[in-house]
Design a protein with these regions (language model features):
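Structural motif at membrane-water interfaces of alpha-helical integral membrane proteins
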Residues: 3-121, 128-237
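Hydrophobic alpha-helical transmembrane segments
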Residues: 86-97, 103, 148-177, 204-314, ...
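Residue-level signature of catalytic and energy-coupling elements of molecular machines
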Residues: 101, 290, 321, 394, ...
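Conserved ATP-binding TGD loop and adjacent catalytic N/P-domain core of P-type ATPases
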Residues: 206-207, 392-394, 434-531
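ATP-binding catalytic core of ATPases
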Residues: 221, 230-231, 334-384, 406-408, ...
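Asp-based phosphoryl-transfer active-site loop
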Residues: 305-332
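Cytosolic beta-strand hydrophobic patch enriched in CBS
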Residues: 316, 388-389, 427-433, 467-469
Length: 531
């Protein structure tokens, strides 16, 4: 099946009568998930108890121990009937496993499933009991072993894996339906935008993971039921195992001329050849991974999303992600006139107070975070990669880079003068009022130790970065120097490239995606690393 489809759509519909399509669906979906947890957990416990009873009875019968009413000395029928009833009841409790497993074996187009091997083992063991009941002389407890116990144990392992999956989905849904804005990470699919934003990176086949704020993650339950990575191999092995079982049956029947031994060989191959942890082999790692992701507020719904995240080689981040609060510091103020220094601070803080840039903390900090001191800014305009233009008290105010000032023909100090003030990861911010330079601010960029460790881990994993920049001072040279990033592994988007990417990262009330996170760099990257 395609990655986006569950292996059995009908089963998914039974397990989840409602998809999470709006916040109003949360109570109903939560009830369905709680019910599923209760049913799968109860099934695993009941089938496990039945398996234990059958294994004990079978062992006692083989050793000649006194079984009381089930003693095989006089007749084997009471024991066989008891075993048959217990196994049939276990199979009935696991009816979805039986139905899905046998359907997957017969109809290859139905998709891959880990249910086939336990279903085959149960059918073969039931057949063994029925044949021994029909021909009691075929069954000798001292020489032949009933496979009902191992078959039920396989059903128990399968049910336990599904119970763990149910607990994982329920816990994930608690985070997904928390009623707060999150962010959804998804693979950028627009080929034109993809080429635009990755031009210049050394990655020949970029798979870009972008993130957008949202309130609801679409298709969460369907994603949670997606095909496991191991299902295809288990389905193929099930067909091979069935072939071996049939071969063992025919060989024993023809060579030993003993039908009882032949049916025991068939059941034995199917029971002992199947992995006990068929679903646990995927359920346990998924559970542990989700617990790790949940600690930093991330949710990866299912195996389809894990596979997709594993193919990602480019991440979209922002300057605020790379230079969190405290990493950018003010190193100097050079007003044109010394008496204008306070006004320069107020104008700069006013221009940056309501824009999404890491620089605003510096200027607001100089005012003591007292917004009452700020001036009203009208017609504020963001010029990507250049700076900001607005009007204060009827005067046009600009704050930004040298390129912004050159665009508006503002006279500036020489480039040689600027170079002397931009060494060691330092940059100059210009403030102009009414067409004239008003002040210069010197800021320094320092790497964040935690961010540096994360970026080093991403670099070693072969991931590159595109920086959707909200800081006009930020460029590739600064990032390569601050975080020791190789050339070709980081790209700062230009204004045109930012516009091309903007629709892909804009807020939507609901969005499809492969991972839900808190919107922070730690949650975004932490969830990706957990996957």
């Amino acid at each position: 099946t395609p990655d986006g489809e569950a292996p059995f759509a009908a089963q998914a519909a039974i397990l989840h009568r409602h998809e999470y399509e709006s916040t109003d669906d949360a109570p109903v979906v939560r009830h369905d998930l709680e019910l599923r947890v209760m049913i799968t957990t109860g099934t695993a416990i009941a089938v496990g108890a039945a398996a234990l009873i059958m294994i004990v009875l079978g062992t006692m019968a083989a050793t000649g121990a006194n079984l009381g009413p089930l003693d095989t000395t006089a007749s084997t029928k009471p024991l066989l009937v008891t075993m048959l009833i217990l196994l049939a009841a276990s199979a009935a409790l696991c009816w979805q496993t039986m139905l899905g497993g046998l359907a997957g074996l017969i109809n290859m187009r139905r998709g891959n499933t880990a249910d086939t091997m336990p279903a085959m083992a149960a059918v073969a063991s039931i057949l063994q009991c029925i044949m021994f009941l029909a021909k009691p002389e075929w069954y000798n407890p001292a020489t032949l072993c009933l496979m009902t116990g191992p078959a039920a144990l396989l059903l128990c392992g399968n049910a336990a894996g599904k119970a763990i999956d149910a607990h994982t989905i329920r816990d994930n849904f608690t985070l997904v339906s928390a009623g707060m804005d999150h962010a959804v990470a998804y693979r950028l699919k627009d080929a034109g935008v993809l080429r635009t934003v990755t031009a210049g990176l050394a990655e020949p086949r970029p798979n870009v993971l972008v993130s957008r704020p949202t309130r609801l993650m679409k298709g969460f339950l369907a994603g949670s039921e997606s095909r496991r990575t191991s299902d295809k191999n288990q389905q193929q092995f099930a067909r091979i195992l069935l072939g071996c079982g049939v071969a063992a049956f025919l060989f024993t029947l023809l060579y030993r001329k003993d039908a009882g031994t032949a049916f025991t060989a068939l059941a034995g191959v199917l029971c002992l050849g199947a992995p006990l942890a068929g679903t646990l082999i995927s359920a346990m790692p998924m559970r542990l991974m989700q617990r790790s992701a949940a600690q930093i507020g991330a949710v990866i719904p299912g195996w389809k999303d894990i596979r997709l995240l594993g193919r990602v080689n480019v991440l979209q981040v922002t300057a605020q992600d790379l230079f969190p609060k405290g990493c950018i510091t003010l190193r100097g103020i050079k007003p044109v006139r010394k008496e204008d220094i306070e006004l320069a601070i107020i104008y700069s803080a006013s221009m940056l107070a309501d824009v999404n840039t890491p620089l605003k903390d510096i200027f607001l900090g100089m005012t003591g975070d007292n917004r009452k001191l700020l001036c009203k800014v009208e017609n504020l305009e963001t010029l990507d990669g250049l700076g900001y233009v607005g009007w204060i008290n009827g005067e046009r105010v600009m704050i930004g880079s040298r390129r912004l000032m050159d665009t508006y023909d503002i006279q500036l100090p020489s480039m040689e003068y600027e170079r002397r003030h931009t060494v060691n990861q330092r940059r100059v911010i210009y403030l102009a009022v009414s067409g004239k330079l008003f002040s210069m601010f010197q800021v320094a960029y320092q790497s964040d130790p935690d961010t540096a460790a994360v970026l080093d881990s991403l670099r070693r994993a072969g991931l590159s970065l595109i920086v959707d920049c909200d800081d006009f001072n930020c460029d590739e040279a600064l990032l390569q120097t601050a975080y020791n990033l190789p050339v070709g592994t980081v790209k700062v988007l230009s204004g045109k490239e930012h516009k091309a990417l903007e629709p892909a990262v804009a807020w939507l009330p609901e969005s499809e995606g492969s991972m839900l996170h808190l919107g922070s760099f730690a949650s975004f990257v932490g969830g990706l690393e957990a996957a």
